[in-house]
Amino acid sequence: ATDLEIARAHICVPNIAAQVTEAHRAACGGALTLADAWAEGQIANGFALVRPPGHHAMRMVHGNRGFCNLNTEAVVVAHLRRQHGIQRVAIVDTDVHHGDGTQDIFYHDPNVLVIGLHQDGRTLYPGTGFIGELGGPGAFASNLNIPLPPGTGDEGYLYVMEELVLPILEAFQPDVVINSAGQDAHYSDPLARMQVSAQGYARLTQLLAPDLAVLEGG
C-alpha cells in the first residue's frame, strides 16, 4: 500500500513512516489486490490471509493498538470507493475482540454499516463494543455491537448470525460485504474464552457469504 492509500484512511502521528513497516504495507497491499480482483469481476469472493491484523487501528495512528497499526479494512474501503465507485459497505467483524478501530473510523459514516460479534468487553480487551454504541448523530444505527458472554459457542454465534445479522444486512443492501475474519473465538485460543469450533466458523462464513474476508486475530 502506498502512502496515499494509507492516508485516505489514517492520520499517522508524526508521519506514516514512523508508524508503518513493510509488513503493514504488504498486508494492506495484498488486501487491495484482492479487492481490485473482486471489483473487476475476476473473482466471486476472496480471503486475504494477511498479517499484521488491523481492526484495532483507529483514524489517528500514534502507536500500536492490540497488534494493529493500520486498519486493513478501512484502507480497502477507501480504495473501493475511490477506484471503483463503491458506496454502501458492510463490515461484519467476527473477531473475538471488539473492532474498536473500525468502529472509530466509520462511526459517523451512514454508508458504512459496522457489525461486531465479540466477547463482552467487560471481560476482554479492548473493553468496548457495547450495544449503546450505535453510530454518530448523522449515522445513527450504522454501528451494531453484539457482545456475547464468555463461553458462547457454535449455537450462539450461528443463532445471532441467522436471526440478527443477516436480516440487518438484507435491509441495508450493501454493495460489498467485508468480513473482519478473526479466528480467535475458537475454543483453543489462549487469550479469549469462547467455544466456537472450526466447523462453527465454517458454517458462520457460509451463512455470511462475504465478498471479501480479511484475516484478523487468532
What is each stretch, according to the model?
Residues 1-218:
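HDAC/HDAC-like amidohydrolase catalytic core signature
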